[in-house]
């Protein structure tokens, strides 16, 4: 079966970029064989192509940087010239390319602006023992009461305030105890996890929150005045803020699933309650980078912004990068004059303020806030997972590469407002929890969408089996139910079957004629703008039909889906524009942004999502088979009967194999070292292994047939087990559930057996559930100790610090989440002694800085568990992982219980860790061993990468000497080919970063080149293999290719073409084998009047060609099994970056790569570069 998906668009359809490239996709061409399409994914309605989506996101972001930089430059110029900044006109203006220098300057202004907000002061200190002051804000002396007019005359020289000067020891600005705190913080592995420090000015003892983070030149210390003199009150206030956040998080977690809108509405209410701002909104970033207000809580007299859409430029990519690095951003007063940062002249560039809590807003943003009547703001990033593994190191404010910025929670206030750092930190935890909850909701929504698509596909397939192909438009459900659209149509055997909003029959025939002429070599097309796709009749269709997806079934049969323009879907809940607001279109204001957004999307539809295109492609494949069967006269009923016969034969053959597997499984279960037992659908025992018999004292013969609930467990476990059985018999399998088993015979005197079980649904060969199997772990020893420990009323230290191996790792928290106990088992497990952790905050200092956690969300989850336990809500078997002092990764289950006084008042929490079994630890050790081998291979590659440069320099030098000699024409051609190969290899070695290829940021070095030279270089690289395998090379290359010139990255094109050709050489059959190179260049006329060169290459060989696993690797984005597949996958991505595409097609007698590369002509490329 063919598999494929659409190509990635070069630009978002509605990102306020005035002349955005068209959002258009092509499917692969299949001619009776197996076709694979560049871009990953595939049929079946599932969503693949995560890497393609990531590359698409990166390409959009890179493109938007240029527009952001241009708007920034226009704003700066308008301020310098005294003219007003017309926001809407600036968006509509035709884009002028921004140079790399302009973009770099723009990013520097945003990230290294050199000013801070005046509600605090900033220091930059050398990260060494000198604590030398590298930079400070001009208000530092005043805030720290170090100015001469603040000091009191004294004869004591030590009372004279130290000067705030570059090069001075920063510790002298603070009280001695505060200096000690700073020294400890500087020595920490992850300094930001200790924030905030409570420090005092040396002279006035005024308290400050010190928020620290490391940068390229040292450590930045942001100082914000604190509101109380007592550090204990400060800690209690911070804990109280965290408790409020945890309470809000608990409410979020209690919401019914499947309602993202309700989740967002609840978040804005809680954030407004927590922070007191006048307006709180949830901004969501769409796939095309534009934003939308999806939830809002506001003061009654404020204008609503719910439903507002705004262009991508309203929140520039540089700002989005800052939100990824610093998740919480506060502006206390947009009218306040910024304070300059004075820095050491020896620093090579302005101080990096990306992570600073005090960084001053840019003038453009401050003006935007003022125009909308917002004086103060608090903005929090909403980060969700985009697939991939967690990062191994946690750093507050930083996020793993597998996370994405979903949106923002934005708070506005109509007067100056400054909330203390502990409350902002608590909000950050709330946002992390919101992100986790949102991620689950989005995954659920995606799964429901996939189920809907699969159900619709199933019904459509059923129609095709029972009826003619026209049933998919004449019956219900129809093809309109497959994806979201305003209309759909089938063009079959010259007849037109429209549904909903569609073009007329005359118009659809015109569209088909255009598709045949301009896109006849593909199997489909999708676009959000027919006008931008180049369709001449787009204007006649009007707003009713803007976007279209089409799938070719046969050369004369087509499926269509249509969408109307985006503006139809969008309504703003805000106030209407009043005629007297004359400057509304020019001022930077939400209404202006909404107007600009509608202007951009007026001729566009909503974009076609990857999952929708996969669903369309799957139906396309099904219909192809159906139409082919119909053409061949195959009876559907006969096909079904034949299929059933074949299925029956397969089942009979499989029964013997299943029996063999079943016997082996029974043997493994019987000899397992963990308790395993099973029940039938009535809950009666039908499996009881030797280990559970040993633990309970009940033999296999005695256990068989007994009721698990009525005969074998204690009454307190009955409800749990009944629920467990009921869910497992429905197919819902639960894990880590504790049950209490009875003991019999000699074992009865030892008391009950506690086991943690995983319930697995048992199925027969027809996949019907026939029972439940329980795989358990005996935790009786730990449970008994834990229960005694929790219930003890007197001195518990004898138990805590008992070296008995039955005592589990235990630590305790006081009411302020500070560590109050750390037993011997915890010391042994973590490598950290009791003295090193007691008194420190468990959240951040102990677990975070001492014991590093795996990913930032792990810290949030631990904080929630701890606060819930302190508040009286126990937690059992919470998965908890961390790195010990030596970097060893520890995986455990955490049980947290409330710690109470005799009168029942909660004073903290007891926490117990249950460590993974030795078998599981051995599996982790094997995994680490594989990681170590991968690291060794990386070192080998780094060595090769370094050493290969010297021979390359020698080849380059030799070629340069030969160029200075008198050579014949054929010798000069050989030299040109050798030089081209050398430069290709140099390019690969120089740009060896696969990450830049993966994320779409690879820089292409474009220039004019000769196609003849490229083909000579490509062929020369496969000649040795051709001769060794005695293969014939067939060249079907027109003479004009030798003289043709094009504009692009010559050596990357050589690399890609050579890899694809070499693959055909390697897998061509040796006997009577051949490899064919075919090129058919032509000129493509674009809608803007320019011409481009279209180069379709075909590399073919007889037979099946590449093995399936290599083809699969080529279109994979993350997992590879073959070395050749990795190389082809990288080349496919490079080709995609150059605007090309590749298909692998397998026909009955031959296989071939079909590569299409579209390149500008050198003259037009040069004219564009100078315009």
UniProtKB/Swiss-Prot annotation:
One of its GO terms (molecular function) is phosphorelay sensor kinase activity. GO terms for biological process: detection of visible light; red, far-red light phototransduction; regulation of DNA-templated transcription. InterPro entries: GAF, GAF-like_dom_sf, HATPase_C_sf, His_kinase_dom, HisK_dim/P_dom, HisK_dim/P_sf, PAS, PAS-like_dom_sf. Phytochromobilin binds at residue 364. It comes from the Eukaryota. Residues 661-732, 795-866 form the PAS domain. Residues 259-442 form the GAF domain. Residues 943-1161 form the Histidine kinase domain. Keywords: Chromophore, Photoreceptor protein, Receptor, Repeat, Sensory transduction, Transcription, Transcription regulation. Regulatory photoreceptor which exists in two forms that are reversibly interconvertible by light: the Pr form that absorbs maximally in the red region of the spectrum and the Pfr form that absorbs maximally in the far-red region. Photoconversion of Pr to Pfr induces an array of morphogenic responses, whereas reconversion of Pfr to Pr cancels the induction of those responses. Pfr controls the expression of a number of nuclear genes including those encoding the small subunit of ribulose-bisphosphate carboxylase, chlorophyll A/B binding protein, protochlorophyllide reductase, rRNA, etc. NCBIfam families: sensory_box. PANTHER family: OS08G0260000 PROTEIN (PTHR47876), PHYTOCHROME 1 (PTHR47876:SF3). Belongs to the phytochrome family. This is Phytochrome B.
């Amino acid at each position: 079966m063919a598999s494929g998906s659409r190509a990635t668009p070069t630009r978002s359809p509605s990102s306020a970029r005035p002349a955005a490239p068209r959002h258009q996709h092509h499917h692969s061409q299949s001619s009776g064989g197996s076709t694979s399409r560049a871009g990953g994914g595939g049929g079946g309605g599932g969503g693949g192509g995560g890497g393609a989506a990531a590359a698409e996101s990166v390409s959009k972001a890179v493109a938007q940087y240029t527009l952001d930089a241009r708007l920034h430059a226009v704003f700066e110029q308008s301020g310098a010239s005294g003219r007003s900044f017309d926001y809407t006109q600036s968006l509509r203006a035709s884009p002028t390319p921004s140079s790399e220098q302009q973009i770099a300057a723009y990013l520097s202004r945003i990230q290294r602006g050199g000013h801070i907000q005046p509600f605090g002061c900033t220091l930059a200190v050398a990260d060494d023992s000198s604590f030398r002051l590298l930079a400070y804000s001009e208000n530092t002396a005043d805030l720290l009461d170090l100015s001469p007019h603040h000091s009191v005359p004294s004869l004591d020289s030590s009372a004279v305030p130290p000067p705030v000067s570059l090069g001075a020891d920063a510790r002298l600005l603070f009280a001695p105890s505060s200096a000690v705190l700073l020294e400890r913080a500087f020595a920490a592995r992850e300094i930001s996890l200790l924030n905030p420090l409570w420090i005092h000015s040396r002279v006035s003892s005024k308290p400050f929150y010190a928020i620290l983070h490391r940068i390229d030149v040292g450590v930045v210390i942001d100082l914000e005045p604190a509101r109380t003199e007592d550090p204990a009150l400060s800690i209690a206030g911070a804990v109280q803020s965290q408790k409020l956040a945890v309470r809000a998080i608990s409410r979020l977690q209690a919401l019914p699933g499947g309602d993202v809108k309700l989740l967002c509405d609840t978040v804005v209410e809680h954030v407004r309650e927590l922070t007191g701002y006048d307006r709180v909104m949830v901004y969501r970033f769409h796939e095309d980078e534009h934003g939308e207000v999806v939830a809002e809580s506001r003061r009654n007299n404020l204008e609503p912004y719910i439903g507002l859409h705004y262009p991508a430029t309203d929140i520039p990519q540089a700002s989005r990068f800052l939100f990824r690095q610093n998740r919480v951003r506060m502006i206390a007063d947009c009218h306040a004059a910024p304070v300059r940062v004075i820095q050491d002249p020896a620093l090579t560039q302005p101080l990096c303020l990306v992570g600073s809590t005090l960084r001053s807003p840019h003038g453009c943003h401050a003006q935007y806030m003022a125009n909308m009547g917002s004086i103060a703001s608090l903005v929090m990033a909403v980060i969700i997972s985009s697939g991939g593994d967690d990062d191994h190191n946690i750093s507050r404010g930083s996020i793993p590469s597998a996370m994405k910025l979903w949106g923002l929670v934005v708070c506005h206030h109509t007067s100056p407002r400054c909330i203390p750092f502990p409350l902002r930190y608590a909000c950050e935890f709330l946002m992390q929890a919101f992100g986790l909850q949102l991620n689950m909701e989005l995954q659920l929504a995606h799964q429901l969408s996939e189920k809907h698509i699969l159900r619709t596909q199933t019904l459509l397939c059923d129609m095709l089996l029972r009826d003619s192909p026209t049933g998919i438009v004449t019956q219900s459900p129809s093809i309109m139910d497959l994806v979201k659209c305003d209309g759909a149509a089938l063009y079959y055997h010259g007849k037109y079957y429209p549904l909903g909003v569609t073009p007329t029959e005359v118009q659809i025939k015109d569209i088909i004629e255009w598709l045949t002429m301009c896109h006849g070599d593909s199997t489909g097309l999708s676009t959000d703008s027919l006008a931008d796709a180049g369709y001449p009749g787009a204007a006649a269709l009007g707003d009713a039909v803007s976007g279209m997806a089409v799938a070719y079934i046969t050369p004369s049969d087509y499926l269509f889906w249509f969408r109307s323009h985006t503006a139809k879907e969008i309504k703003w809940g805000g106030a209407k524009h009043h005629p007297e607001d004359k400057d509304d279109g020019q001022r930077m204001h939400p209404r202006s942004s909404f107007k600009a957004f509608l202007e951009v999307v007026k001729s566009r539809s909503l974009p076609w999502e990857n999952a929708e295109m996969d669903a369309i492609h799957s139906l396309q494949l099904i219909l192809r088979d159906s139409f082919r069967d119909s053409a061949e006269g195959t009876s559907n009923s006969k096909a079904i009967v034949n299929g059933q016969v074949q299925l029956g034969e397969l089942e009979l053959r499989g029964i013997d194999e299943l029996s063999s597997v079943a016997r082996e499984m029974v043997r493994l279960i019987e000899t397992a070292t963990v308790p395993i037992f099973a029940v039938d659908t009535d809950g009666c025992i039908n499996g009881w292994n030797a280990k559970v018999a040993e633990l309970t004292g009940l033999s296999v013969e005695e256990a068989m047939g007994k009721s698990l609930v009525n005969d074998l467990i204690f009454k307190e476990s009955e409800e749990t087990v009944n629920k467990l059985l009921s869910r497992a018999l429905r197919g819902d399998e639960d894990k880590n559930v504790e049950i209490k088993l009875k003991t019999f015979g000699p074992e009865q005197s030892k008391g009950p057996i506690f086991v943690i079980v995983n319930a697995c649904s048992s199925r027969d060969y027809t996949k019907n559930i026939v029972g439940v199997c329980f795989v358990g772990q005996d935790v009786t020893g730990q449970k008994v100790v834990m229960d005694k420990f929790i219930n003890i009323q007197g001195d518990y230290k004898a138990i805590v610090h008992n070296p008995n191996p039955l005592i589990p790792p235990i630590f305790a928290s006081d009411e302020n989440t500070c560590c109050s106990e750390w037993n011997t088992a915890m010391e042994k497990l973590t490598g950290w002694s009791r003295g090193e952790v007691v008194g420190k905050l468990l959240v951040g200092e102990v677990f975070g800085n001492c014991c590093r956690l795996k990913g930032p969300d792990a810290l949030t989850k631990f904080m929630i568990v701890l606060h819930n336990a302190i508040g009286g809500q126990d937690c059992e078997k919470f998965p908890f992982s961390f790195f010990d002092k030596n970097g060893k990764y520890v995986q455990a289950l955490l049980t947290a219980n409330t710690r109470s006084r005799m009168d029942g008042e909660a004073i903290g929490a007891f926490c117990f860790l249950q460590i993974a079994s030795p078998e599981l630890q051995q599996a982790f050790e094997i995994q680490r061993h594989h990681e170590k081998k991968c690291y060794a291979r990386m070192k080998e590659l780094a060595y090769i990468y370094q050493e290969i440069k010297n021979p390359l320099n020698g080849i380059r030098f030799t070629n340069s000497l030969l160029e200075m000699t008198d050579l014949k024409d054929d010798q000069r051609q050989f030299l040109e080919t050798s030089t081209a190969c050398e430069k290709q290899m140099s390019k690969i070695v120089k740009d060896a970063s696969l990450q830049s290829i993966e994320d779409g940021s690879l820089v292409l070095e474009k220039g004019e080149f000769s196609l003849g030279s490229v083909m000579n270089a490509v062929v020369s690289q496969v000649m040795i293999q051709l001769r060794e395998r005695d293969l014939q090379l067939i060249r079907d290359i027109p003479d004009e290719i030798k003289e043709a010139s094009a504009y692009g990255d010559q050596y990357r094109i050589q690399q890609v073409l050579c890899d694809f050709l070499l693959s055909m050489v390697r897998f061509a059959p040796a006997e009577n084998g051949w490899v064919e190179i075919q090129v058919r260049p032509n000129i493509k006329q674009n809608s803007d009047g320019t011409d481009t060169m279209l180069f379709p290459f075909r590399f073919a060989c007889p037979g099946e060609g590449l093995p399936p696993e290599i083809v699969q690797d080529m279109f994979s984005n993350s997992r590879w099994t073959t070395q050749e597949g990795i190389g082809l996958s990288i080349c496919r991505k490079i080709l995609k970056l150059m605007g090309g595409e590749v298909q692998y097609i397998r026909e009955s007698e031959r296989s071939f790569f079909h590569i299409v590369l579209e390149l500008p002509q050198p003259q037009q490329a040069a004219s564009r570069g100078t315009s």
